[in-house]
């Protein structure tokens, strides 16, 4: 069993039950899924850029991403409906806990001038969105093989009803929020 999952069952659940006075342990919020999304603007003119992004996302997540396509045409961007413009991957279960552990303990501390993640990135429903400016913070990415520095969005979906519950859950998991 994953280190974080074990910590969740043995330490975090009892702590959250006592803090928020839940009647049942089933009310305790948990991380449902993590969605990693990357947009590839160059994909319109250069189809190889998308292949590189998919390859990097596969290395980071340990799972093959789905190619996202344009919903509608935008003439200003030379974009047609249905053109591939990005990639996303949804992690659940073991892989989700493994990725989250790696993100919190290895990747985020590698960000330049890192002072913690923003407390304001909750959406009001207990989900947290984190923008990463470069894929180089992940240990799986080889610096020499990177063709272009790409950012990505990481969305952590929880079963929490409020932002306060979700913030407490992620803090217990070791998410480094700003002071």
Curated annotation (Swiss-Prot):
The keyword Ribonucleoprotein applies. SUPFAM superfamilies: RL5-like. Keywords: Ribonucleoprotein, Ribosomal protein, RNA-binding, rRNA-binding, tRNA-binding. The keyword rRNA-binding applies. NCBIfam families: PRK00010.1 (NF000585). Belongs to the universal ribosomal protein uL5 family. This is one of the proteins that bind and probably mediate the attachment of the 5S RNA into the large ribosomal subunit, where it forms part of the central protuberance. In the 70S ribosome it contacts protein S13 of the 30S subunit (bridge B1b), connecting the 2 subunits; this bridge is implicated in subunit movement. Contacts the P site tRNA; the 5S rRNA and some of its associated proteins might help stabilize positioning of ribosome-bound tRNAs. This is Large ribosomal subunit protein uL5. It comes from Bacillus cereus (strain G9842). The lineage of its organism: Bacteria, Bacillati, Bacillota, Bacilli, Bacillales.
């Amino acid at each position: 069993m994953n280190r974080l999952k074990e910590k969740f069952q043995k330490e975090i659940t009892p702590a959250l039950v006592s803090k928020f006075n839940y009647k049942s342990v089933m009310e305790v919020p948990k991380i449902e899924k993590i969605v990693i999304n990357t947009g590839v603007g160059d994909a319109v003119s250069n189809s190889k850029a998308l292949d590189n992004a998919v390859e990097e996302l596969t290395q980071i997540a340990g799972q093959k991403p789905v190619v996202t396509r344009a919903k509608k045409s935008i003439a200003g961007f030379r974009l047609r409906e249905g053109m591939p413009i990005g990639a996303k991957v949804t992690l659940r279960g073991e892989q989700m806990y493994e990725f989250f552990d790696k993100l919190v303990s290895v990747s985020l501390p590698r960000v330049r001038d890192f002072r913690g993640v923003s407390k304001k990135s909750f959406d009001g429903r207990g989900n947290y969105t984190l923008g990463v400016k470069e894929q180089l913070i992940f240990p799986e990415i080889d610096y020499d093989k990177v063709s272009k520095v790409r950012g990505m969005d990481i969305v952590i979906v929880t079963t929490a009803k409020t932002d306060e519950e979700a913030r407490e859950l992620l803090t217990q998991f070791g998410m480094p929020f700003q002071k």
